């Protein structure tokens, strides 16, 4: 296992997640969620139309223009970097220039393998504009791992600063991804990242494997929302990397769980909380105790996510009244009511 010391997640709820609302995120939705992601400690945030720059004009209109997405989000943030996706033949060079002029920090150039040569002018301009420039090879598994690495080398020679393995079909097993990573690292001298989809339930596992094999970034979305079966889950990946690997300590994972429950579950119209199930899994606490723990948290006005985690730290088999009281006493001074009230007050996805 070799971990990149500069590893960060790249949060793409506001771009890939835009698919699930038919590109309906407004610029207000985008800037508000970006604001609370930054507040949670996320440093890299991708925004905009699911198909990237220019797609509103050429494919299907989004709820906001590319310019408004960038301008409104940039004006809201103080430290986090924002980026957008761009597919040559959908996006134009002028689209990238306009976005850069408005303060875009990074650009992710998406191409199918057979269109690699289209990258040259886009990479050249993006680098000239001082954008952090990534190449995302969509449908990476359409060629074998050796051929993939050869095309990645071409993108590096054009000036790309990072190569993304993109499991567009969500079909890769961990052993497949490991081979792509191995062959890629023998060919290029720049970092790599991974963007997974969850069609066969491998997005989280593959993202962790990429992390363990020196990826600079893996892409995540809150609750895994995204095109098709979705992506790796921000709250799950952050919590696992914090608890099992001691990484991403600057991110407030508990706050992200609340974002997932209070905002994204509402957006999805979920009747049963997926976030709570994730929290129980992360804490190794059986969901047979869920009702009991929820009721205890309400009666004692304690954060349910913190309570579940504290219970898991004490006992992953039993959950009687004594265990819950002991867990409660261990966290009762960890007050986060102000930040959660702030989250409740921030209106988006609902006007």
What are these regions (language model features)?
Residues 1-351:
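Catalytic cores and adjacent flexible loops of soluble metabolic enzymes
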